[in-house]
C-alpha cells in the first residue's frame, strides 16, 4: 500500500512546520487557512492533495516555493485565482465542484484536468498514513 503524510490544521498548525524540510513523497493537507506568514515548510513531495483548505491558503502556499517537486496536485479546494491553475505543476486534478474555475481561467491548459469529487477521495483511500520525514531546518532568512 502507498503511504502519505496527512496534515490537518486541527492537529498540526502550519506555524509548527516553519523552517522544516519534509521529505514525504505524498502529502495530504486538510483544512488549512493560515495566511499570516510568508515563511513555511518546504515539502519535497511529488504528490500533493489539498482538501478543504481556505482559498487564500491555496493562493499563498500551494506553489513551487513550498512544493518544488510536486508533479501531481489534487485540488479539492477553491483555487482562489487564475494564477493557481497556471502554476508549473505537471498535472493539476481539480475536483468537479470547482470545474467552473477551469472553464473560466484554464480552459486551454491541458495539464488541468477535472476529476469527479468521489475520485479524489477514492484516490486518497490508496494511501496509508505515515509519519513526518524531516530533512533539516532551513536557515533563518
Curated annotation (Swiss-Prot):
It comes from Acanthamoeba polyphaga mimivirus. This is Uncharacterized protein R849. InterPro entries: DUF5845. It comes from the Viruses. Belongs to the mimivirus L163/R849 family. The lineage of its organism: Viruses, Varidnaviria, Bamfordvirae, Nucleocytoviricota, Megaviricetes.
Amino acid at each position: 500500500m502507498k503511504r502519505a503524510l496527512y496534515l490537518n490544521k486541527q492537529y498540526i498548525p502550519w506555524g509548527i512546520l516553519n523552517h522544516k524540510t519534509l521529505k514525504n513523497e505524498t502529502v495530504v493537507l486538510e483544512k488549512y487557512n493560515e495566511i499570516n506568514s510568508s515563511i513555511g515548510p518546504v515539502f519535497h513531495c511529488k504528490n500533493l492533495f489539498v482538501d478543504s483548505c481556505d482559498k487564500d491558503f491555496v493562493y499563498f502556499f500551494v506553489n513551487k516555493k513550498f512544493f518544488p517537486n510536486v508533479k501531481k496536485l489534487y485540488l479539492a479546494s477553491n483555487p482562489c485565482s487564475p494564477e493557481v491553475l497556471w502554476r508549473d505543476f505537471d498535472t493539476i486534478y481539480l475536483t468537479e465542484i470547482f470545474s467552473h474555475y477551469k472553464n473560466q481561467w484554464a480552459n486551454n491548459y491541458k495539464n488541468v484536468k477535472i476529476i469527479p469529487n468521489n475520485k479524489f477521495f477514492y484516490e486518497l483511500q490508496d494511501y496509508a498514513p505515515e509519519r513526518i520525514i524531516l530533512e533539516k531546518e532551513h536557515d533563518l532568512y
